[in-house]
């Protein structure tokens, strides 16, 4: 009886998957067959976490006349992706620490190492990102500071995997919060979300 029931359930599952696949084939049109689109934009950004919000801000500031659309699968009350639940800081290594950070990230991604050209670009961006972050923050009355309050504190940092070569380097950890506050829960993402809103960028949940 149990074997028969298990077989019946398996057949039902296979049937459901088959019907679902057939239904999908009926309503999903290959992109090369689409002649007319309901809407066209200059920049389409999928995901409204910190990366999506930052991309939207940068796209707008490069071309204020560009049509930008951000799509987020979650409801607006749960927007922010992983970014809103993270430690709420940016890692900003000193420019003198770029090679050390490259070594650390290289070791973090073994046995599938990141190409050196990309690592160089990424780490140079880490080390020079702070002025842009402060520019975005200032535009919505936010500021970058130490996560416990006060100004940024530069010095020796040890990141997550301290057993990896390159895990210790000079830099700071920058938290974003409303001006005058000491800490804001979700402040890093909320700052960029406010910057997106200020620019009138279309976000759909």
Task: Locate the predicted segments by residue.
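Positively charged n-region of N-terminal signal peptides that target proteins for export
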Residues: 1-9
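Conserved redox-cofactor binding core of oxidoreductases
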Residues: 124-205
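Sec-dependent signal peptide cleavage junction
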Residues: 15-27
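Glycine-rich FAD pyrophosphate-binding loop
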Residues: 61-83
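Glycine-rich active-site loop/strand segments that organize a redox cofactor
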Residues: 87-124, 129
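Conserved Rossmann-like nucleotide-cofactor binding loop
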Residues: 51, 55, 76
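Gly/Ala-rich phosphate-binding loop of Rossmann-like dinucleotide-binding domains
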Residues: 56, 60
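Beta1/beta-strand and adjacent pyrophosphate-binding region of the FAD-binding site
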Residues: 34-51, 69
